[in-house]
Regions:
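Residues immediately within or flanking Cys/His clusters that coordinate Zn2+
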Residues: 9, 27
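Short cysteine-rich clusters marking metal-coordination/redox-active sites
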Residues: 12-15, 30-33
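Cys/His-rich microdomains that often coordinate metals
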Residues: 16-19, 37
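Short Cys/His-rich micro-motifs in 6-15 aa windows
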Residues: 34-43
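Alpha-helical segment of the N-proximal tetratricopeptide repeat
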Residues: 45-72, 76
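Short, charge-rich amphipathic alpha-helical segments embedded
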Residues: 68-102
Length: 217
């Protein structure tokens, strides 16, 4: 019977929770968000810490900084499929959001490319060095990302531009609504009444899932 090991440096790519891993396995399911995902080969603490740092940065949408660390991992071990996959997630600005209907984590793209993810050299290297279990997940996620990208490009081409973009902070550090958000709401209604097309996230995106709202921004 395989024992489970907890590696404090290995975090969930979707929610950041600590993963409980079966020894010698290359995929794991997060006990916090329930997402099955690929995991890297951890040969030592240095590699584990690098993956953790890169993942933390990506979860904070600091994609360029995260990509630098994934490239550093590749420099240490060019057979790390997860490092190449991490680079892909950064190139496309992937963030995982919770679907309010299914409660599953789904990808949303903060960056757009006209090229298919499957044509990317880093994707090809991730597939090359992945085992069967990892390939299945990589290919499924890549397909989902490609569909999102197509949707983004379609919306971007067809959506009429906004006259005004209202940017504000919704909540403060304690989670309470900010005064700015109240003011933003008033400004939105005032400008809308005056005939302007206004982008105001709280209303413009209220019926959009995370993976769908990025094109409008």
């Amino acid at each position: 019977m395989k024992g489970k090991i907890k590696m404090s440096t290995l975090k969930c790519k979707m929610c950041g929770g600590t993963l409980e891993i079966n020894e010698n396995e290359t995929t794991a399911t997060c006990e916090y968000c329930g997402t099955e995902q690929t995991i890297p080969k951890i040969t030592d603490d240095v590699v584990g810490n690098l993956f953790n740092r890169a993942n933390t940065l990506r979860l904070k949408s600091e994609f360029d900084k995260a990509e630098e660390i994934y490239n550093k991992i590749v420099g240490l071990d060019n057979t790390q499929s997860e490092a190449y996959w991490g680079i892909i997630l950064c190139k496309y600005g992937i963030e995982y959001v919770e679907d309010p209907t299914t409660y599953k984590r789904v990808p949303t793209c903060h960056r757009t490319s006209y090229d298919a993810i499957t044509a990317d050299e880093d994707y090809k290297l991730a597939i090359q060095y992945a085992d069967i279990s990892q390939k299945i997940i990589y290919e499924a996620v890549a397909k989902a990302i490609d569909e999102i990208q197509k949707g983004i490009l379609t919306i971007s081409q067809n959506e009429k531009p906004y006259d005004v973009f209202i940017c504000y902070k919704e909540t403060d550090e304690s989670g309470k609504r900010t005064q700015d958000s109240v003011l933003a709401n008033d400004i939105y209604h005032q400008l809308t009444q005056e005939g302007f097309k206004v982008f105001y996230a709280a209303i413009t995106l209220e019926d959009k899932l995370g993976q769908e709202y990025e094109p409008y921004i």
